[in-house]
Amino acid sequence: MHIIKPVWLTHGGERKDFEVYSCDVSPDGSRLVTAAGDGYVRIWSTEAICNTNDPAVASKPKQLASMSNHSGTIHTVRFSPNGKYLASGADDKIVCIYTLDTNPPSHATTFGSNEAPPVENWRTVRRLIGHDNDVQDLGWSYDSSILVSVGLDSKVVVWSGHTFEKLKTISIHQSHVKGITFDPANKYFATASDDRTVRIFRFTSPAPNSTAHDQMNNFVLEQTISAPFANSPLTAYFRRCSWSPDGMHIAAANAVNGPVSSVAIINRGSWDGDINLIGHEAPVEVCAFSPRLYASQPVDKQAMDNQHGAQNLVTVIACAGGDKSLSIWITSNPRPIVVAQELAAKSLSDLAWSPDGKCLYATALDGTILAVRFEDGDLGYATAMEENEKSLTKFGTNRKGAGITETPDGLLLEEKSKAGEIKGVEGRMGALMGDDQADNITNEKPALLPSNAPTPARPSSPAPDAQKSQPNGTATPSAPEPEKPDPYQAKLERLKQRPTYTKDGKKRIAPLLVSGAGAAESSLPQARLMASVSNQVKADTPQSIVDLSKPFDGLPKGGLATLLFGNKRKLAQLEEDDDGHVEKRVALASQNGATPLLTNTPDGLLPARPQPAPTGQQPTPEFIRPAVTNPCMAMSQVRLAVPKVRNQILRAIDPNGKPTEPPSASGESSKSRVDVVFEARNPSAASLTGRAVDREPVRLTLFRGEQPLWQDFLPRTVLLVTGNQSMWAAACEDGSVYIWTPAGRRLVSALVLEAQPVILECNGPWILCISAVGMCYVWNVKHLSSPHPPVSLQPALDAAIHTLGAHPSAAPAITNARINSEGRIVVAMSNGEGYSYSPSMFTWQRISEPWWAVGSQYWNTTEAPVGNLQTADAQKDKDAKAAVSAGIIPFLERNTTSETLLRGRAYFLQRLIKVLLSREGYESFESSVSIAHLENRLAAALSLGAKEEFRLYLSMYAKRIGAEGLKMKVEELLKGLIGGLFEEDEAGTAQRLQENEQEDRNWRESSETLCGWPREVLLKEVILALGKHRDLQRVTVPYAKLLGVVDGESDVGDAMET
């Protein structure tokens, strides 16, 4: 080891040398740059420094250039890793960007100075203004895509490494920020501050033409580390930290271990600092890892390849600070291998390694600039950079810089992509401020709204006194002529704020909250799982539309209970009841109002004797008795809770045919909203003859107001009723289902099921019935058909993990079971999972689950709850096809959020994922899960035919895989979108489609539409979203040419508004 300190290597002044605050080495190792208090940035030849005694080098120039573009002391200077730029920051609050001009310098030495004439022509290309105080440190990402500056104004400013536009200002530190370092895997950067914290920020490298809007949700805080710096002194001039070349550790300066100054080694992933380097007598102000990995023996590349990296490689770190000493550590040794003291008269301010790891440069506040040259074996034996890349591959590293557009078409596509994004931003801002109201009124083209965007809801008006009566028992309300609304009045209504009053009587203004899919514009959104705590004030925003039947006969709190039985269960053996448990249980049930049907006697089961009638006035019971269990349930592997027999069952619809609360349940105020009420009244008295078969019939009546429209009788007890403007249905205790036309004519003979019905829903002509053994039936009363055979709920109840059990086990409860306008069954469970049955594949599909809620960055838990959704009236929508399956995916995901938070699973799942992220092999876990979540959403929207959701999720997916640079997925997506658009249909539609398969619900179809959208429109949107990524232009430009995107002007606004 040699310490070299040339006399000429200084920022000289008239009386003394100026303080040198920073130094750095160029990526090719040929230049050393220094910054000092004289306001100069000086570039030196490293060859001249390290070979001072060599006569052959003495004649070569030592100082290559000097720049004086700052008006004060320069605190930091850094080369970009691609070697193209040089950045400096000073106390004039400015960051200057220099670049090397190939032309020789045009000016000689400044008049009146002793400066040597410049050898290289470094010119200033940009002056970056963004700080309010001194700039203390700078850092470049390893792909040179961003530059980050920190300063005494507590700000962290992110600049584009291509255009040097300010991308984001992060004001999260509470005091001066004095250090920054970047992760070599290009995933994080860390900042150190006088608020005694080191903060880790996660980022995705922005594209060359990215704007501040693009990066709104990029550069997010990952972790705050404060324990190692709890009592660290605030007198240090710098807190320059460093990231190890293998990406595993951060060396943080100015840490403390008890009363002793130390360097904290922070582990990646867990972000804990349990290792400390102790030995310096004053605060350590700068740490620097060598850029190479070292081996204990001379490195043979072929031997390393044969060992597949089995040889243990170590890292080397240099530390310096206020005690004017330099220490060098190796990770395999608990003590420093080199300690050099009194290297300068004042504190050492900065350290910089040469790219080959053989030379270390140091600067000090007394003006000292020195070099420490190591011989082979002093630190170990440096390995090739390929070993660094191998160690970083487990983090999913992406260190390549931005490519260069290869053709003018690629540049034109990039410009159109950016122009479309700007237009989309302007459109969203106009909608936010209410400026688009007039345009929406006069424009004939329907606005393209995402599924969770606020949709205007039609106001409900009271039914008129005189309505035209139809033979089907429903009324057709008179439709007034639509008046042209005042656009200015509509704008005022949109911006109106509702006043509310607190408990103490103070007036408060509840602002309108705008929620939409615009937050997913960035390629790296934030995921938050939080509970809603404010639902006292009803939202002023219109409710979202969901294409599902509205449950009129609500399920019990917590959902419909279910039981699963395994294949190995044993039937219970009948034994003598010595203690009389059965009699006690029967007596207790009789006290609660239950009526016995059978009596267990020595002669066997006999009909129970009628009970004496109670005397006096008795209240009307809410239910009469439990339903009789069907014998087939004894052998079924699935059992659902059966509703009790109620005295009165009501179903009410409003004049628009939508379900509503019956008058008896909602009071007098709701009578004006009720048009027709369907009532089933079960007999509450015992049989007059004493025989169960002689009980009174059930009376079914359809009312309009107080007037009955028709009446019918059934000999069997009714459990559930449903209906709408198209039909009425009742499900009985013996498993039979009866269906009437609106006029009261029986449409079909009784439909007999294998067990009692527990859920009965309808939507248009479709009826959904679920029996007590978990069988789901769907009927179309218009065509008297079914889209598929009866299907069991057993797969959706996690039955696969209970099939071999010997005892019954509780399964997830059913919290929602509905049907959409196409007859698709949608089921939500109490464990947070949501399912839909696919008639074309004859299987259940899991649409939503808690895994996405805690693992995906695209999960949104801050939107409106499930209760704010209203059912869609597809018959009255102008575009009925656009309303198919609308809102089903957000509905199921919101149910997942509420159930996950309610049962506390979110906490444990988040802890699990946090542990996984710190383990080796799971570094790309969050990104992979987020992309998989988008793919699941996309597949669900396509299967359900949810038109608006499909377009929204397709745009989000294209932007994410483009930002991640997943070329194979991009190419596959474009091939799937183009389908057979430009191919001749030789096989014909009949051969393409299978039975029960929709024409535009398949990627591989040659139809011109996909999920209701023209394939050409979707393909153009995806190409424009991917066009700004230069590394993908070899894939996207041919498709852009095929569609004519780059041939002429085209409307790209709609493509980016989603």
UniProtKB/Swiss-Prot annotation:
WD repeats, residue ranges: 15-54, 69-108, 130-169, 172-211, 233-276, 279-339, 343-384
Alphabetical list of SUPFAM superfamilies matching this protein: WD40 repeat-like
CDD domains: WD40 (cd00200)
BP GO annotations: chromatin remodeling; DNA-templated transcription; regulation of DNA-templated transcription
Primary residence: nucleus
Role of this protein: Required for replication-independent chromatin assembly and for the periodic repression of histone gene transcription during the cell cycle.
Name of the featured protein: Protein HIR1
Organism ancestry: Eukaryota, Fungi, Dikarya, Ascomycota, Pezizomycotina
